[in-house]
Design a protein with these regions (language model features):
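A structural signal for short, hydrophobic/glycine-enriched beta-strand patches
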Residues: 1-202, 208, 257-267
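A conserved mid-domain beta-alpha-beta active-site/ligand-binding segment of alpha/beta enzyme cores
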Residues: 187-255
């Protein structure tokens, strides 16, 4: 059993990974924050991506009320985690109705409508991984003639940096603005890892760890990663030594934490 001191080191390392992966380019999604950073109070498009915990729906709704974009899109078909997401949403929102085969975009749309009385402009319901989340979004915007020179990308914090790297490769003329759907810190409480606060639908700590750990090899630009030197899915990502060190220590302590991607939904 890990000592309190060892768990505190684990918490620090988890938070290092989380801070690196869960990027937010502005402190809040408001016109003022965008204007201070980019010189414009609105982006052309904001996209919420399936794969996020349910709290992403609240982030989108808050952004819509604030008016941070001209067009709002929810992106996400049905992938290998969608049934788990459906079950989680039914548990959290038993009065929310959606079809048994609903895509993640449709589920988020139902949630935003039911809880906030709001509706996104477009749904993209065919993509099944981060890679075609971006390419299908790009193609949908082009098909509808929607200008997109600036794009707010809002994804689960564990996958936010990957989403931005995908957009940099597939939409090179577009300014990506990252805003992860949540920001949490892991602490030690009663001899266990715990969250400082838990957003709606938050992963349990073991699942959160596997999601964080699985991202670093993907982002590593070598023959095994998703970057230009590997599978070619992403733009190059620099991984700081501090992040690499935290990942190495966590892997040594929790070798089970490395998840394997389902090849049907890789990307």
């Amino acid at each position: 059993m890990a000592s309190e001191q060892e768990l505190e080191q684990v918490a620090r390392d988890v938070n290092v990974l989380a801070s690196f992966l869960g990027t937010r380019d502005v402190p809040s999604l408001t016109p003022r924050a965008l204007d201070e950073r980019y010189g414009a109070a609105q982006a052309d498009v904001m996209a919420l991506f399936g794969g996020s915990i349910l709290a992403g729906g609240d982030v989108l709704a808050d952004a819509m009320r604030a008016g941070v974009a001209r067009t709002y899109v929810i992106v996400g078909g049905a992938g290998h985690t969608t049934e788990t997401f459906r079950e989680k949403v039914r548990e959290l929102c038993p009065d929310l109705t959606f079809a048994g085969d609903a895509t993640e975009a449709q589920i988020f749309s139902s949630y935003v409508s039911h809880v906030h009385g709001l509706k996104a402009d477009l749904l993209e319901t065919s993509s099944t991984n981060c890679g075609n989340n971006i390419t299908y979004l790009r193609d949908l915007l082009a098909d509808r003639g929607i200008p997109c020179k600036s794009l707010i990308l809002s994804q689960d914090a564990t996958m936010q940096r990957r989403m931005v790297a995908l957009a940099a490769k597939e939409m090179p003329g577009v300014l990506p603005i990252a805003f992860a759907t949540y920001s949490v810190r892991v602490t030690v409480r009663d001899g266990e890892l715990a969250y400082d606060h838990a957003p709606l639908g938050m992963w349990d700590t073991s699942r959160y760890l596997t999601l964080l750990m699985g991202e670093i090899p993907r982002l590593t630009d070598d023959e095994n990663g998703y970057g230009p030197r590997g599978k070619g899915f992403l733009a190059h990502v620099d991984i700081p030594m501090q992040v690499r060190g935290a990942w190495d220590r966590l892997l040594k302590r929790y070798p089970w934490s490395m998840r394997t991607a389902d090849p049907r939904y890789a990307g």
